[in-house]
Amino acid sequence: MAVLCAGAGFCCACMDYGPLHEEPFAQSQRGVFITCEGNFGWDNASLSFYDPAARTVENEIFIRANGMKLGDVAQSMTLHKGRGYVVVNNSGAVYVIDPATFRVTGVIEGVVSPRNIHFPNDTTAYITDLYLSLIHI
């Protein structure tokens, strides 16, 4: 009986946003982005935002701001020139987001298994790949 009760409590604690829909957010000022890679193969990566001034955390901001899942294995995130680049490894994509609204402004596709993105200057980006012995430029 105790196992059943504990299991029921665990299921109730899960985040459930129902059908995918978009939510508006107040413009963020300063804070910390937190990527959670999720479970490999489960398509449950997430992105959260911590506001240290307000001492609040907004979880699942990607799905809530865009009405779509982030994907499978959020590997890393980099901020560059007013944009956020979220590298989603097993989905083979790099999402470009507006860091103030968390909304997607673009996507970089055509990479097999991206890991990290680095900007050596304002016009070049390097994307490492887990399975290929090359760096995308």
Language model features with spans:
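Bacterial Sec-dependent N-terminal signal peptides
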Residues: M1, A6-V32
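Conserved beta-strand positions in repeat-built beta-propeller and related beta-rich domains
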Residues: I34-W42, L79, G84-N90, Y126-Y131
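Short loop/turn segments that connect beta-strands within beta-propeller blades
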Residues: P52-A53, D98-F102
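A short beta-strand motif characteristic of beta-propeller blades
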Residues: T56-K69, R103-I108
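Beta-rich, blade/repeat-based domains predominating
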Residues: G67-H80, V111-A125
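Active-site-adjacent structural elements in enzyme catalytic domains
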Residues: A93, P99, V112
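Conserved small/polar residues in nucleotide/adenosyl-binding loops
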Residues: I135-I137
